[in-house]
Amino acid sequence: MADVALRITETVARLQKELKCGICCSTYKDPILSTCFHIFCRSCINACFERKRKVQCPICRSVLDKRSCRDTYQITMAVQNYLKLSEAFKKDIENMNTFKSLPPEKMFMESQMPLDITIIPENDGKRCAPDFAIPFLPVRRKRPSRPQPPSAFAEEPAEPVEPPEPATKQPVELQSRVFPLEKLKKDVETSTETYKISREELKNVDIEEYINTLRENSTEIDEIDALFQLMPTMRQFLRNNINQLMEKFHVAPPKKSEKPANRRVSFASSQDLENIKIMTASESLETPPEPIQKLAQKPEVFKSTQNLIDLNLNTAVKKPVVVASDDDEVVEDSEGELQIDEDDLANVTCATSSTTLDADRTPKAIQDDEDRIDDELSQVPKTIVCSRIHNDADEVVGLELLSDFYHKFLSNACRFAEDVNEHTTHLVMMNSEGRSISQKSTAYLYAIARKCVIVGRQWLVDCITTGLLLSEADYTITSCSSTIPVKIPPSIGSEMGWLRSRNDEHGKLFAGRRFMILRKFTMNPYFDYKQLIELVQQCGGEILSCYENLSPEKLYIIFSKHSKAIEESKNIENLYKCDVVTMEWVLDSISEYLILPTQPYKAVDSIGCLQD
């Protein structure tokens, strides 16, 4: 009977394996036949075609065609008969006497399928714990056993405490007592819990016996060092509780000598040490020192701020005084100390003479200061931007130069920024040599569009050297070694483009001109098309979004040399009859602040030459 049941189970298992979908791995639901003659669920194959246009069979990896997939009547009937067979098999199991003895709530616990939905409690956020008819056997967790105490301590009886007799004791007995401690140490190191020693065992330990044994081996160490060698943690313990030990043993702390604390130290120069004279208190009051007499000869310096000068006078007089008593100590001052003190006193004198109290100032002086402050606030502050340093060898020197200039001149009248913006007034070309630059940068173009003053690097150096913000007239950029493919007429002049931009205060270079700058035409690895749009807008140009139904007059469609749309540039030029130029025409026009001829910048010729 068991063999028949086993064969039936194997046959049903093979049938179930053959009727399983290769995508969802469950029994077919509405099966269809694919072009590779494999069968899948209709919902599974439709979901695959919705996610991908090109679907491969998960079994043979061949490309499937959705239109060629068709229904299979035979497979559909086979699946239905299989489901009926499983339903009948379930009913037969329910009718068997073996399962009738089980309560209905535990009849299908092995399959984890509820007999009735009402058994699951409602409004419960989690599933009930499974209750099996045959419970699992409890499994014990493996835990490390507690280490057993050493057998030597268990077998050896406690010995009474005897007075120490180091001379008569045999070293063999000491070794027998040391061995259990070494064994205990090894057991404690391998155990997982701290080993606890009883109080009786601690009483039986003779520390002097161990100390004497250590001193016999090495006579250089004393008893305290031997104790620390025997118990290393004792050193830190005694150090932390040194005060309590002194109280327990009634040891008085050492007294501090108060004589050095009461001694006064006066500083004097080497010349004063030669003429040093010890005076009494009465003599010091009758004859004041020489520095006080010198200060008393010029009282007019301290008329305005008497309180401040009294304080500074006292501090200034205390240093050169050489009056000393029996407890005084005279220390020779370092060279130049007296000179530094005189300089400090001179600085205090200048500060007090230049600043007076409001009560002593005249209304005219107050009004002059207010006018000066209003004049400073009314002026436009200088906002300085420095170009990037492209030379690695000069980068460190340039950064130090910028740091010195920043810390020296940062104020309300002089500010700094990282990029050129609407508040920028000056651009410093860090790669300049004298009043000439080798190439033009993006910051240079932004400075021309913002009508900024462009100066060379030497301006920073001279400002730091003199300590003043010098005029920019002698440090402006007047030439550039890089050339453009267009010759500028002599009638226009040879001045730089930033000078033309500043002379045209209210005008715009591209006023009344329209530009079509599309991303697909202006892709450039060295220059972002968004920066190009921003430069054109700052120069007064109008940016268009499409180029249909537009007048070709003053219309420019911009391409990049790196663009591959050469055919489209030809079609646009033939269709709309407008100027189709490269972005270099825009950049060179801004750098020279002129509307340059477009013939050398034709996009058709430039793109073709680059691709060739």
UniProtKB/Swiss-Prot annotation:
Keyword line: Cell cycle, Chromosome, Cytoplasm, DNA damage, DNA repair, Metal-binding, Nucleus, Repeat, Transferase, Zinc, Zinc-finger
One of the protein's GO biological processes: double-strand break repair via homologous recombination
Catalytic activity entry: S-ubiquitinyl-[E2 ubiquitin-conjugating enzyme]-L-cysteine + [acceptor protein]-L-lysine = [E2 ubiquitin-conjugating enzyme]-L-cysteine + N(6)-ubiquitinyl-[acceptor protein]-L-lysine
Zinc finger feature spans (RING-type): 21-61
Top-level taxon in the UniProt lineage: Eukaryota
Pathway where this protein functions: Protein modification; protein ubiquitination
Principal location class: nucleus
Xref: InterPro entries: BRCA1-associated, BRCT_dom, BRCT_dom_sf, Znf_C3HC4_RING-type, Znf_RING, Znf_RING/FYVE/PHD, Znf_RING_CS
Localization annotation: Nucleus; Chromosome; Cytoplasm
EC number assigned by the record: 2.3.2.27
Post-translational modification: Phosphorylation of CeBCD complexes is required for E3 ubiquitin-protein ligase activity.
Residue ranges occupied by any BRCT domain in the UniProt entry: 415-477, 505-603
Subunit structure: Heterodimer (via RING-type zinc finger) with brd-1 to form the core CeBCD complex. Brc-1-brd-1 heterodimer-containing CeBCD complexes bound to chromatin are activated as an E3-ubiquitin ligase in response to DNA damage. The heterodimer interacts with the recombinase rad-51 following ionizing irradiation; the interaction is direct. The heterodimer interacts the E2-ubiquitin-conjugating enzyme let-70 following ionizing irradiation. The heterodimer interacts with the pro-crossover proteins msh-5 and syp-3.
Protein name as catalogued: Breast cancer type 1 susceptibility protein homolog
Biological source species: Caenorhabditis elegans
Annotated gene: brc-1
